[in-house]
Curated annotation (Swiss-Prot):
Pfam families: PCRF (PF03462), RF-1 (PF00472). SMART domains: PCRF. The lineage of its organism: Bacteria, Bacillati, Bacillota, Clostridia, Lachnospirales. It comes from Lachnoclostridium phytofermentans (strain ATCC 700394 / DSM 18823 / ISDg). This is Peptide chain release factor 1. Keywords: Cytoplasm, Methylation, Protein biosynthesis.
Length: 358
């Protein structure tokens, strides 16, 4: 581990030397690449320098204890030694986490698909509530939401909603949300007061750029139809809605949220790129999982990941056995505790894998 850290420190110093040369800005592409690499390495290099300084403090305290006879000075050295040793353990753990491989998609925007599953109207109502939950969380993170498609059930529920969340690090925070979300409560339509269980499927996909996915437009078929739902005066009077079919995979995407056919077409292509990119990521994940211990969940949208029990005010994430009795807060978008716990569990699993390799 420390050989790797020393290599990173040397590389960081090389970059700084290059950036200090007066001619560095002559090649703007090279300059931007160096600046990005410096930013990427900055945090781990700073932490490694802190580690080295703390080790030096320990050595100096030990030397002082060997040489010093004054009791007051010896007590100060003992305190400094104890503090430095405790700090060293913490810094070493922080370095291990910083050395974990970065997910190249973490900084990306996300496309979110929420669909009602088992439970009919009750599932659709809960799908709408999950949309509100993620919208509230996005609001606290100062992210922007862009609706792509909405299929309502007539009583305030969503059979399906597709939307994009634009914001730095959106995928890093929301990537653990993919899977089946189960709700247990008494539906408003239940006259007998019985608790029902319904399910909603959530898919979180990183936005795919054109460079991420090779898309042959000859493989795409576009059909237009009249919008049904919100959309202003153009609803049901113009063929502005778009249905995109990707013939090699059979993926079908409908977008009708915009009044413009062209905008709906662009949104459908964004969703298609994200789904094709997700298929590639799933293949890579399956290959990696065959060689490594499982991390936090499988990322499979068919995996049951969480239960929201309204009579008990309880939310349980089954992957990490986390139970919270702050259900109302969670449904109002206060997801940070859950997200932080999932991130920590994922990091712990990756650390275990890394230690097996050393």
């Amino acid at each position: 581990m420390f050989d790797k850290l020393e290599d990173l420190l040397i590389r960081f110093q090389e970059i700084q030397n290059e950036l200090n040369e007066p001619t560095v800005t002559n090649d703007q592409a090279r300059f931007r690449k160096l600046m990005k690499e410096q930013n990427d390495l900055g945090e781990i290099v700073d932490k490694y320098l802190e580690y080295k300084q703390t080790k030096k403090n320990i050595e100096e305290s030990l030397e002082l204890l060997d040489e010093e006879s004054d009791e007051e000075m010896r007590e100060l050295a003992k305190e400094e030694l104890s503090t430095s040793k405790a700090n060293l353990v913490v810094i070493e753990e922080q370095l291990k986490i910083l050395l974990l491989p970065k997910d190249p998609n973490d900084s990306k925007n996300v496309i979110v698909e929420i669909r009602g599953g088992a439970g009919g109207d009750e599932a659709a109502l809960f799908a709408a509530e999950l949309f509100r939950m993620y919208s509230k969380y996005a609001e606290t993170m100062r992210w922007k939401i862009d609706m792509m498609n909405l299929n309502e059930n007539g009583i305030g529920g969503f059979k399906e909603v597709i939307f994009m969340i634009n914001g730095q690090g959106a995928y890093s925070k929301l990537k653990y949300e993919s899977g089946v979300h189960r709700v247990q409560r008494i539906p408003v339509t239940e006259s007998g007061g019985r608790i029902h269980t319904s399910t909603v499927t959530v898919a979180i996909m990183p936005e795919a750029e054109e460079v991420d996915v090779e898309l042959n437009m000859n493989d795409c078929r576009f059909d237009v139809f009249r919008s049904s739902g919100n959309g202003g005066q153009c609803v049901n009077t113009t063929d502005s809605a778009v249905r995109l079919t990707h013939m090699p995979t059979g993926i079908v995407i409908s977008c009708q949220d915009e009044k413009s056919q062209l905008k709906n077409r662009d949104k459908a292509l964004k969703v298609l790129r994200a789904r094709l990119y997700e298929l590639e990521l799933e293949k890579a994940h399956d290959a990696e999982a065959a060689a490594r211990k499982s991390q936090v969940g499988t990322g499979d949208r068919s995996e049951k990941i969480r239960t929201y029990n309204f009579p008990q005010g309880r939310c349980t994430d089954h992957r990490i056995k986390l139970t919270s009795h702050r259900l109302d807060d969670i449904m109002n978008g206060d997801l940070q505790e859950v997200i932080d716990s999932l991130t920590a569990a994922d990091q712990a699993a990756k650390l275990s894998n890394m230690q097996d390799e050393y």
